[in-house]
Amino acid sequence: MSGPRSTLGLSRRALLRAALAGGAALGATACTPSAPATPLVIAGGVRPGVYISLAGTLADIWRERLGLDGAPQVLTTAGSTENMQLLTGGAATVAISQVDVAADVATGITGPGEPMALARLYDDVTHVVVRRDSDFRTLDDLRGARVSIGPAGSGYQPIALRLLDAAGIGADGLGERAELGLPEADAALRADRIDAFFWSGGVPTGGIRDLADELPIRLLDLGDVLDRVRQRFPVYSVGTVPANTYGLPGPVACLSVRNVLLVTAAMDDGTARALIDAAFLDQPRLAQASPAAVTIDSRSAIGTQPVPLHPGALQFYRSAKDY
């Protein structure tokens, strides 16, 4: 899959150099850049993970395509919530986040610090993983169980709490609550220290696939609570994990959430446009970084609502005439 052809009048290298310098007028985008002359800092995610893989690949693409003097810095983080804190606090200039977390953080923020999207990237699905030989079949069965809801700062802990609330359990209804990342939750399930864990990621998620290769698992079907969750939080959608993804007994209904690439309103239009232009030119490299990124294209990339597109990104999509 190839990205749309660039329509910028200036070379991308010249464009971003001018944008980051904050001085030259860019006739191709009819704007005057005003971004400070600071290096790009990308808030990524946990290692290993899709976020950190895509962030690292984007850093390489932008350095090579746009002739940056230094490679963008990629930050290892707990995930969406921490990424949004870094972005809105000025410690990062670019971030990847679930759109629900981004929308929650953006509420009430106006002016230069307002989060704005460059693109929708791919969709995550929420996994609730249990051993196949267990008696757990629905979320309600987790009442009194030992469950990991994900680490603080991740994007999927809020999803886990919302799902548990919709099931009438809530976090207090669990027997023991842990806040483990995927590798730690994987190890804890293998060692029978927990009964279940929540995870939100692309399908397939490598860590879950590796676990399923060694330990028969099931994913809890979320179909009985999805309508209640979506009535309160329409940002979510319904998805399905096919049976053959992890050798499951059958397909599983799940909750799906979009992931978006974000900057703030402080970034000038020329820089924002150059970043997304370069990313689409090298979209196959993003797909190589993670199978989840195979679906990235400019037709679906505009679907970042309720987070607004940055004006520079909107210029790019309009010029691409591909939606």
Regions found by a protein language model. Give the residues of each.
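N-terminal secretory signal peptides
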Residues: 1-10, 18-28
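Bacterial signal peptide processing site
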Residues: 32-34
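Bilobed "Venus flytrap"/periplasmic-binding protein-like clamshell domains
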Residues: 39-65, 70, 74, 124-191, ...
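Pocket-flanking alpha-helical
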Residues: 60, 73-112, 128, 183-189, ...
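A structural signal for short loop-to-beta-strand junctions that line the ligand-binding cleft
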Residues: 111-121, 147, 245-253
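A bilobed periplasmic-binding-protein/Venus flytrap-type ligand-binding module shared by bacterial periplasmic
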Residues: 125-136, 232-236, 248-270
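An extracytoplasmic/periplasmic, membrane-proximal ligand-sensing/linker region
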Residues: 180-184, 190-191, 201-214, 219, ...
